[in-house]
């Protein structure tokens, strides 16, 4: 949070971690305790923080928009927000737009990537099996008009320059 403030970033993104399979009550208590520490630091530095859910394989603390809304309600800070990596709900068989519907004005960021349809692998937006044009239309129809990031992750580590060129072409194609 301190570095984000010094760099002048719009927000700092924090992904939900994994508790190591603690029982739910202990897991939730630890999550809220950690997020309250983050809240205090964010408020002291006036630095917005965005929380990202992950899939159940990556996190056992917060994986659905309803859980994220509950966490944001519990912490209640004007500087804590939620976001959606569209691959996460897609591989879980959920509608990514539910994040916008459930979080409302606390929903401030999208990670746009595509999916191979069976795991967390992130492909270039528009090169997988997701109906990306429909997803974009649905987010716009839900009133979302904030930030988005086109994600390139480890799948493209061998040739990131070529992948960057492809993702920029896709951004132009989708007018992002």
Task: Give residue ranges: language-model regions.
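Histidine-acidic metal/acid-base catalytic patches
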Residues: 2, 8-10, 36, 62-84, ...
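Active-site acidic/histidine proton-transfer and metal-coordination neighborhood
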Residues: 1-81
């Amino acid at each position: 949070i301190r570095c984000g403030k010094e760099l002048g970033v719009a927000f700092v993104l924090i992904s939900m971690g994994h508790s190591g399979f603690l029982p739910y009550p202990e897991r939730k208590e630890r999550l809220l305790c950690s997020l309250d520490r983050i809240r205090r630091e964010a408020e002291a530095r006036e630095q917005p923080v965005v929380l990202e859910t992950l899939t159940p394989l990556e996190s056992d603390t917060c994986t659905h928009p309803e859980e994220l809304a509950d966490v944001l309600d519990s912490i209640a800070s004007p500087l804590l927000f939620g976001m959606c990596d569209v691959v996460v709900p897609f591989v879980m068989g959920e509608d990514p737009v539910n994040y916008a519907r459930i979080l409302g004005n606390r929903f401030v960021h999208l990670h746009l990537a595509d999916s191979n349809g069976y795991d967390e692998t992130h492909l270039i937006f528009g090169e997988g099996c997701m109906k990306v044009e429909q997803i974009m239309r649905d987010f716009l129809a839900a009133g979302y008009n904030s930030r988005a990031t086109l994600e390139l992750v480890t799948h493209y580590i061998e040739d990131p320059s070529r992948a960057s060129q492809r993702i920029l072409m896709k951004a132009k194609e989708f007018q992002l």
